[in-house]
Each structure stands twice: as C-alpha cells, then as structure tokens.
Amino acid sequence: MEYLDILNNINEEDQEIKLKPHDRVLIIDGLNLFFRNFATINLTNNNGAHIGGLGGFLRSMGTLINKVQPTSIYVIFDGKGSTVNRNNINPDYKANRNINRITNWDSFDSLEDEHESKLDQLQRLVQYLKLLPIKILSFDKAEADDIISVLCNQLSYDKNKLFIVS
C-alpha cells in the first residue's frame, strides 16, 4: 500500500463544515505533524516495532487539545496529486528532496523497512482518527497548506478562534 492509497480511504462524506460563532477550531497539518514525530521520536511497542509517528502524533494532538480546548478539530492531509499544480508553475518545486532515511537511529535495517513502517503507522493513524469526533480533510490536487488557507478563510467570518499547527 502506498501513501495515496491511504489517503483515498479517507471518507469525503460528512465533510460539511458546521460551526457556531466564536468556536475554537484546531487545524492540524496531518502529514507535517506525523513526519515530525516519525523522524524525532524513537518510540517502540512491546514487540520492538517503531511507532514514533503514530504515538507521537496522538500524544501531540492530546497536548494540543488540552492547551487549546477546541470545540472542533480538523486534521488536513495533502491530497492525491497535490504537487502537480505547483510543479506546473515551478518544475523545481520539491525537486531537491531525496528519498533518504529520515530517522537517525537503528530501528530500521533499511530504507525500505523505514518506508514500510511509515506507511503502516500512517494507515493506522488515519484509521484511529476516523474513530474520533474530528474532521479529516484531503482533496485531490491540493496540498494541506492550501486546504488550511481556504478553510481558515471560510471559518474566520464568524469570529471563530483558529489555531493552526503546521
């Protein structure tokens, strides 16, 4: 399974935005928070498998919820083909990104093992997030930051307090 397959499993139903004036809205760039935790938290489960991305994301989200006390939470993921538009404008967009290991410890024997763990954790994260009372948004050909921008413009008119984590 690849990253885009995981995102395709995000239900696009029930993504209507229903807020009341003065709501406190927490908006999280899902991949950004996931990758930061995956790369920096060397957390393993009882079987010795790396779960830093998953565990770190959930721990970070819990901390954010305690601090912000949101009435609504949105986790935004890059959509399928999200870099296409920017690559059309600038062919060098993200061109310098190499496929390298992003962790600096020995939890993985190879780049392939790290990649497999990353996809497994991301898939489980999306499954867990679907069980929570939050909205998960991902739209084809749109990057998370673009979706967040549109969402903020849409939500700000009712004097909602918006908290963005990216």
PLM regions with names:
Residues 2-7, 17-165:
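Noncatalytic, basic helical substrate-engagement surface that gates or grips nucleic-acid strands
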Residues 12-13:
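Catalytic core of IPPT-family isopentenyl/dimethylallyl transferases
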